[in-house]
A protein has these predicted regions:
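An N-cap/entry alpha-helix motif that binds or orients negatively charged groups
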Residues: 27-107, 202, 211-243
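Alpha/beta enzyme core
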Residues: 177-285
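Hydrophobic faces of well-ordered beta-strands that scaffold small-molecule active sites
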Residues: 111-114, 141-143, 162-164, 190, ...
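N-terminal secretory signal peptides and thylakoid transit peptides that target proteins
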Residues: 1-15
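Acidic (Asp/Glu)-rich catalytic clusters
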Residues: 152-159, 274
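Glycine- and other small-residue-rich loops at beta-strand/loop junctions that grip anionic moieties
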Residues: 65, 119, 123, 143-144, ...
Length: 285
């Protein structure tokens, strides 16, 4: 019975099983148990199931949602399941080096922590806890404009410079002030998000929001994002739909940070990023 229980748990976590939630529920019914303690989690798929149980519906929806019917999320899972590791034998694996050097950043791990906003909604340590974990495991970190914690405090917690993810508002003077603040905090690169030209139809978030009977004002009232402190954001939009490739040159005129374009989806845009002087790109999936 012990081996059968272990087998079912590992099977539930397989990335080949794209409909994880339904399968996890079936396994839980078979085992007659449900994970309730994060210390019992052994993989990220179980963590997602536990998070759904522990996190308020609206907050879980914000974290888990895709766009429309979440088809892209499903396509991501399907796509990764088609990757296969090609093992090569009888090579010296006694000293394996996974370190990378990206735009002057030397990291022990090739896995970068991409920006996730509003982490204070999920843990009291918010981005400070993430920064400490990144430092402990040798991961580089990109901090969101929408972070719950200031870039200065996160940089101090990590003990090393981070990269800053930027939403260029429709007020250029605010964008310049955010760039200057990030650079003053020690950020070596700024990652300009370009794949959010307008509002998204986040069906999963909307659906779970309706199931949440809490008053959102209880935890959101008067909580301006730290990156917007000192800025006049009255009536401003988080993103500027009028941006063109010229923004790369404009940014380089006001900052010495590397300018990385985040949200590239087609090869033609990758070529344009190079043409207009971007120092790097982050491909959106």
């Amino acid at each position: 019975m012990t081996h059968r229980r272990q087998f079912l748990k590992y099977l539930a976590a397989s990335p080949l099983l794209t409909n994880y939630s339904a399968f996890a529920q079936e396994v839980e019914e078979t085992l007659g148990e449900r994970l309730t303690d994060p210390r019992d989690v052994i993989n990220v798929f179980e963590m997602e199931a536990l998070a759904r149980e522990r996190i308020p519906p609206a907050h879980f929806g914000y974290l888990a949602t895709g766009v429309d019917s979440d088809e892209t999320l499903q396509a991501n899972r399907d796509g990764f399941s088609r990757f296969q590791i090609k093992p090569r034998r009888l090579v010296d694996a006694s000293e394996v080096d996974t370190s990378v050097n990206v735009l002057g950043v030397l990291a022990d791990s090739p896995i970068f922590l991409c920006p996730v906003g509003s982490q204070g909604a999920y843990h009291s340590d918010a981005e400070l806890g993430t920064a400490r974990a990144a430092a402990a495991k040798g991961h580089h970190m990109i901090l969101s404009t929408q972070s719950s914690t200031s870039i200065e405090d996160v940089t101090e917690a990590r003990g090393a410079p981070i990269w800053h993810q930027l939403y260029s508002t429709d007020r250029w003077d605010n964008t310049v002030l955010m760039l200057q603040r990030a650079e003053a905090a020690g950020a070596t690169s700024v990652c300009l998000t370009i794949d959010l030209p307008g509002r998204r139809n986040t069906e999963t978030q909307s659906r779970l929001f309706r199931k949440d009977d809490r008053n959102c004002l209880d935890c959101h009232r008067g909580q301006a994002k730290p990156m917007f402190e000192g800025l006049d954001m009255r009536g401003a939009r988080l993103t500027d739909p009028s941006l063109t490739w010229d923004v790369i040159g404009r940014m380089k005129q006001v900052t010495d940070m590397n300018v990385i374009i985040k949200g590239i989806e087609v090869a033609e845009d990758a070529a344009s990023a190079v043409e207009y002087g971007a120092d790097g790109i982050i491909v959106s999936n």
